[in-house]
């Protein structure tokens, strides 16, 4: 156990976050996401919602400042419903953890899957909200 590290962060997830370089992306996926068929580097965070993971990760994580939107979510498929509270919950978690909210954009479902395949890792959470997936892009960590 380390002091100052959120208990939702497993050793495997901490190691992954530390290994990521600027421009790398990590997917925080809901419990329904086809992580194992899309990616070889899958980390389990069963029972932990994505807003809790965002609260835990974002204080340790610099968002990419060189892109328009370092946050990406999946658009609802036409004719399907999307709970707008999911996006709000995620942005509130980030705001609470770091004091600001980076820009967010949404991708079509299969574009999101393509992007997820290129990510550094996929974290499968206990999130049960439909379309509850988010990709976060790491930026350059400032030198202390």
Swiss-Prot record:
Enzyme Commission code: 5.1.3.29
Q: Primary place of residence?
A: cytoplasm
* Cell compartments where the protein resides: Cytoplasm
* InterPro entries noted in UniProt: L-fucose_mutarotase (IPR023751), RbsD-like_sf (IPR023750), RbsD/FucU_mutarotase (IPR050443), RbsD_FucU (IPR007721)
List ligand-binding residues for substrate: 30, 109, 131-133
Its BP terms in the Gene Ontology are:
fucose metabolic process; fucosylation; L-fucose metabolic process
Coiled-coil segments:
none
Q: Which GO terms describe its molecular function?
A: fucose binding; L-fucose mutarotase activity; racemase and epimerase activity, acting on carbohydrates and derivatives
**Annotated active site:** 22 (proton donor)
Q: Which reaction does it catalyse?
A: alpha-L-fucose = beta-L-fucose
Q: Which UniProt keywords apply?
A: Carbohydrate metabolism, Cytoplasm, Fucose metabolism, Isomerase
Q: In which pathway does it act?
A: Carbohydrate metabolism; L-fucose metabolism
Q: Which GO terms describe its cellular component?
A: cytoplasm
Class of this enzyme = isomerase
Q: Extract the Pfam families matched here.
A: RbsD_FucU
Purpose of the protein: Involved in the anomeric conversion of L-fucose.
State the oligomer form and interacting partners: Homodecamer.
The entry's family comment says: Belongs to the RbsD / FucU family. FucU mutarotase subfamily.
Q: What is this protein called?
A: L-fucose mutarotase
Organism for this UniProt entry: Haemophilus influenzae (strain ATCC 51907 / DSM 11121 / KW20 / Rd)
């Amino acid at each position: 156990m380390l002091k100052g590290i959120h208990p939702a962060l497993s050793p495997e997830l901490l190691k992954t976050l530390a290994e990521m370089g600027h421009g790398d992306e990590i997917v925080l996926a809901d419990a329904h996401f086809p992580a194992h068929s899309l990616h070889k580097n899958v980390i389990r965070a069963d029972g932990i919602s994505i807003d809790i993971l965002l609260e835990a990760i974002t204080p340790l994580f610099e968002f990419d400042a060189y892109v328009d939107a370092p946050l990406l979510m999946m658009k609802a498929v036409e004719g399907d419903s999307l709970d707008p509270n999911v996006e709000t919950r995620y942005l509130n978690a980030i705001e609470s953890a770091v004091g600001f909210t980076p820009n967010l954009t949404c991708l079509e479902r299969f574009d999101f899957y393509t992007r997820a395949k290129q990510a550094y890792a996929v974290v499968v959470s206990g999130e049960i909200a439909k379309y509850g997936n988010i990709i976060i892009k790491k930026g350059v960590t400032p030198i202390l």
